[in-house]
């Protein structure tokens, strides 16, 4: 039990942190027993200190021997070195540690990570002017260890002992981080602790963002707020503050190499010179070595300090190395650091910013120019930055890393950028390096789930706190290692041994109730409400007043799960049983040999076996050795008229459209070594070539003059004994595995000087010569020339200089090299079939030309020279098509011994064969889908559809024929597809017209017009009218003309307006009258005599009403002071503004006293200043047989000047005036 004093001090120091609650989204870890996601539980750690959560444990660390007996508390590396010098200890580099705390008692069996750093590893510091310092890192300073926990299967440990214990402990249940406590905190805890004083803090990886760091604890002791560390993707939280992994860049880019003056030649390391690596075998499960260069930027240097940064970075990489040795990866990957570069200042050509994409591009280009002084290069480069990076902008955001996919071993793409986030940085590096190995995120284009808690999950959130490699990651890695690109990883590291001893299990020390308290607080207990729950798979706990909940973490090994039962390996078994032990994988039987890939010329056959007998499980090891074996088959020569195997593969694409066009393809062979096994073809008649396939068919020769063959995209060695992988070679005499005893090598030097621009004989090489080598001893301006005895020049003849390259003549292949910085060189393995004369085209000074060749010994057994035979042979061109019927041109050629073409005069002209066009490739082509052009999209925006004709066809007998769709490859190409998915601009939406305001004659009708979004894939939304200003707004009103109204329906009673009140106060009256009127179609009324409307019922309306009901004020003619008061005076009414139809008349009203303006009149007594007048209807003259029209073009001005009431204007402008009265 922990002492109360220690716990109290810890709670006091971390009081402020304990007030912070776990984000609500962390509840995704604790599921209620009911399983309802809508019923979230409160955070399990609310209101309690860190120590009470069970996520943290203060442990005491000390060294023990292999038996577990105490050795010393001095565990730091320099202390152990001093102690080992004083006392010889058994075990060599083995280290045994004990971590003991209130909740954990762990025994660590470790071994020095001797292969973490390459021989000659150095740390280089770069400043503005270049290298500032180079620090050697001798092997005895290696303070990094890897190993496992004793008696805990499937566990791993990666720690450094440089300055206390720092690193990672992985169990099958969860991942832990271990850190030393700061010295000032250690001393305080030591004064309050009883027994072993705690020196380290052990906490789960899922809580790292809350873990105490040295500067944070110092800030807390000063009663300041805890500085919030960077969030990263190893948090379980899914809230807005979570760091997401915007990484794994699929963009296949190739940055331009930097200029020569920007290349940096660092001397931070001097690794041992590599031997020439053998080619990596396909499908081999061998130990692979990733030689890694680590670069640390200035921001991260400032954060950790120059004195601590090396230890910190190597500790992180030691953890990364352990992650890549995890058994779930399905391979043996060793991370070996070949150099560490510390950037104290900005470097030319390297731009590091918040923008992760730009930083990655710059770093990949910059590191491509780095190499050791001995010319060695790293396989992989890692940039560690202290900046808060973002994948898409130059501002801080939630990105943790960035990397190209499948960039490993590439000079320009084997690089990653990683943001420093504490010890969790190791998982970021492993994740991004996984992308470089060709891995993509789980759940993105594969069958693995995002939430399974694997290292390649889009967001690093462990399952039960444990992180592993998914089956998809294993497949991606296996696929990458089977390519030629992985050749840089062929180095083999030394294996690391592990110790395993029996010991008491954690579940025996801490029962299920105690484990619940650690996870959910002091009041939590094992949930006993549902006995069907298996605590060996998920520990279910409950607190008072709450439902059962779990973090989906199994109970610890050895926990009691029933009567005489305990948990072992996730299963509840009888007490004493070990449960499922680690099962190591074993190979299945070999499969039968596959059919040969070629019928002649040397094909490939293979057989496979799987690691399934049984599969590795419960921490078992993966099978060692090869999953596939290969052998050559059908090695006999192909007939002389057969088509070249590589040319046949190119011809297969003649019937396939390339960017919309058909071409005739021929092999393009001027390739770099890494591209020999890619199918590069050049379009006949054009000057471009293209890689039509990333690998040729198995058995294709790597090059024309090589026995090596391509297998699964890699060039594999074939010996002269025709055995795959054999190192057998021919000696100078052409004898396979010979010792040069059957021939004599002739050597000489030609150093004469002559006049320039002439050919001079140097040496004559007889027929049958082998191992020919002619070379300049120094660079000169002269040229080596070769001809036969008949003065036919094959190289540099007739004062014409040929390009360097491969040349075939005299029955042999010659390799001609000429460079401006190297001497001229001509080589050939031979043998030649005619005498060759080597000459020198003399140009200036002759530094000397050396030559050598081999001839059979005179005493060797010779066979009499056979007389040459001359015969005709038909040489056919390639078929115009690869199938379905084509034509090829045939011509006759004269050959010596059916090998060497000679002049036609050597052959009998009477036996010359008939030549011309002949049919070829008449066999039907494979069925394929014939697709037409897409139709016009049904919509211009907002998501439409388009279709195209698709039919299954096969070319046979020179024409295309339709066949059933079932005979074509499935699935069928899509017939329909979406198109124009971009959002549509807003537009005016019109509603239906309402009914006309009239039932007959002329009226008005209305409709609604609104601006709406027109995207059919989303719900229409009303927008402001300003959003539709790009097009005019439709009308909302329009005139409607109906049938002519009947005469009798025009008559109606109209009521006039109320007249003015007869008095201003004290009881007056107002009147209005009913008049008979006739309404025209135009809407204008005409007053008629009342008798014409007698047949119509009068409306029941009040025609008189009282008004002026306000009492008249009673006031003296004088004011309160006895002075006289002013009175209101009104002028006569003005003339009415209209003679009919309603007008207005006005008058002036003033307050006067004795003829002078005054201001003391009562406002309520003020008379009206305006009044309605002439409210009767205007008469309309109607003449039979005429119609209303305008007689002048200026009639539109009449109503604007109010002249329609004038008799002349109303008559001459009848139409305009009638409309103005509407």
From Swiss-Prot:
Residues 1-20 form the signal peptide. The active site is at 432. Disulfide bonds join 364-415, 390-397, 409-488, 448-472, 516-541, 527-548, 536-567, 561-572, 596-633, 600-638, 611-623. The keyword Zinc applies. The keyword Transit peptide does not apply. It is found in: Secreted, Extracellular space, Extracellular matrix. Its main location: secreted. This is A disintegrin and metalloproteinase with thrombospondin motifs 16. The gene is Adamts16.
